[in-house]
Amino acid sequence: MRRPLLIPALCVVAGVGAAEWLPDDLGRGSLLAACLGLGMAGLWARGFMIGLCVALFGAGALSYQATQWPLDPDDVRWRIDGRGELGRIRGILAETPSVRLTERRGQWMERTVVRLRVTGWRPGEGDWERASGQVLVSSQGVPDARFFRGQSVEIAGLVSAPPGPAAPGLFDYATFLRRQGVGLQVRCEAPGDWELGPGANDAIPWSERFLTWARGRLSEGLPDDGATRLIWAMALGWRTGLAGDVDDGFMRSGTLHVFAISGLHIALIAVLLVRVFRLLGWSRAVCGGLSLPLIWFYVGATGWQPSAVRSAVMTSVVVGTWMLERPGDLLNSLSLAALVLLLLDPGQLFQAGFLLSFLVVAALAVFPAAWESWWLAHRPWRPDPLLPAARWSAGRRAWETCERALCRGICTGLAALVASWPVSVECFHLVSPVSVVANLVVVPLSSLVLVANALSLASPVGTALWNAAAWVGMHGMLAASRVCESIPGGWWSAASPGAWVWVPYALLWIAAASVPLDTRRRRFAWWAAAALWLALTLSGPSHPGRPEGTLTIFRSGEAFWIDRAGDADDLLLDTGDAATAKAVVVPWLRSTGVDRVPTLAVSHGDVRHLGGVPVVLTSTPPWRLVAPVGRTRSPSFRALEGWASAARIPFRRVSAGDTVAGIPVIHPVASESHSRADDGAMVLRWDAAGWRFLLAPDLGSEGQAALVRREGSGLAADVLVTGIPSSGEAATGAFLSGVRPRLIVIATGDRPATERSPPALRRRLRELGVPTLWTERIGALELRCWKDRLEVRDARGELRARIDRADRATDQGRAMAW
């Protein structure tokens, strides 16, 4: 067999995937499969390979299920209610605490994140109880240097389930942690909630001392600026250096991978070590035997980061093959590395880093050499084949050298783009063709920076000189990234392609890796299938049951998105405050493939609804900006026209009788004057698939009364979406009598306290008997409209309410909410 380890690795992948997506009672089946496969492999000579594959499938499923189901009765996932419980938790830090930076109101806030192996739990004022399992600790601020990997600690805080997605389609943190075997999160308010636990160790580990020394060494003679911190991030895996717009710039240019301790770092170290040892005349066995411990020392010194461990395993397999003087096959070595990693830590299969690492390296093993050979053989200006290379002119030799290097770089970039594209879209909602060009510049510069870092750490002299060279190289990387990011059409946002993309995608890769494309017929068949898959992916799936309209309400109730099927004139109503816009609204828009908002409308002058307008104008600029008529004391509302003018975006004010993105405005009226901004909030009446929505964000009691007087029975709607005004009563009885809704959505947040729904309102709506949903409790909601039904789903996709319409003419049907 050409690549004997490829199929076993795929069997383990299939087993882990089956354990995640098939029913929970797969456990006995996977155990049976593992035993059956082992028996078949041991007793039936001809069925050895089949039995081995079945056994590996079962082993992969069992290995993953062992991380998902608490086997110990004292596991914290059994003992603690995920809804939240205050207490103290005791355990061992499983890693070095990682500091994350978050920008809030123009200031950088520090937050510490670390995994904890639990040994004990004390609920409230009770006694200590034995416990096991893993939790994730998230704490405001940064604890002191006494807390490091392997330290015994006691932490006080709120133990609860991790948060789910902030909006439909965004990153699901709870699922991510669950797949890593972490089911609970401990939230702390300050480093004062951390204490040393029993048996605490005062001796700082060698890896912590090395990182402290290395950061000081690499910053010697350099200013304390972003480039210096990025050098720490790239050479030492210091994640804190990647914060703010720097992270986004490298992400969009497709060069963020250089800051993860991954294959680029490990391969460069391995090549440098082997070259140096070979110059000394040492044998392969000696070179490999000395290089591998040094590689693993670097991995351990930088904190055993998953990307570094993956790359070290791959490199160890390749170097081991070279040491033993065995025929090398990169794809076969890659399969062995994946097999080992997934059996030891199956949750890595669901990490974007794992998928990108292995898919990109697999692509580099399959495609670039063939593409380069094809180009060199078919280029119009290829040299005379009868003229020996030794007789070429100096200009011709220089041209050939440059062309081959450029061709190799472009083929490598294209192969990496082809391999990473679906995963990048699925995980990061980003397509970056400019990465092919950007990596031609950034990757060589990053290699030079890493070499300078290595010389700075290893050389006793010239430290400041090597650091200066690395600093200049890092500025070159920043400049190249910014230039490539600014190229029109170089990158764009894209919606997740969906599961239907993965099956043909995987089949194409398996075919390319397993079947030699050495005949014209095979090559034509493969490329035809790849072209068909690409065409279907770019055109997007056509779902006959796709909703005719969708209303997305964000968790805080301060922003709404109206999406009409087949209509590009969608609407963003409000943006939330600056933090909500940056953390939720803009990422969600990009997750749906929106780089420019067709229409942005501001409902009223509450800063919690329009504070994020500058963020949206910068990140996903709208084609037009709309605001209601009326006077307000809000400085932000008064600044809207100036913001639009500065961004060269058309701005207009609307009143009752106008339309916004084709949706009628029914409030406010230009002739009316309201003393409070909430009473003059813009109210929209939107019809989708025969369903009528009344959108009245934070409409005050005076505004509600004015609407009832003016519209009368014309206010009737199937769904009422409103919020909590700053003063006055929300959803008054007269207003509800005029609207006569079949479903009410109270769109409000839980912070600050004034945004929360008052108990009197909750009691009154319960007595009304109309199904009511509260975003402060449920989170973001998505209302999907079909002609025969209306469904409301939360951010996880769970059904929360449904309205059926059996007879649209008589408006009969039933409504349910849960």
Region locations from a protein language model:
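Membrane-embedded alpha-helical segments of integral membrane proteins
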Residues: 2-43, 351-354, 358, 464-515
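Hydrophobic alpha-helical transmembrane segments in multi-pass membrane proteins
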Residues: 7, 15, 23, 46, ...
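Membrane-interface helix/helix-cap signal primarily in integral membrane proteins
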Residues: 57-257, 583-587, 596, 630, ...
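Residue-level signal for inorganic ion chemistry
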Residues: 15, 91, 353, 420, ...
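Non-globular, low-confidence helical/coil segments that flank catalytic cores
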Residues: 143-145, 151-152, 156-158, 175-176, ...
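N-terminal leader/targeting segments
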Residues: 1-78, 82, 86-87, 141, ...
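Hydrophobic alpha-helical transmembrane segments
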Residues: 2-6, 236-240, 302-308, 387-390, ...
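Hydrophobic alpha-helical segments of integral membrane proteins
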Residues: 203-221, 230, 238, 246, ...
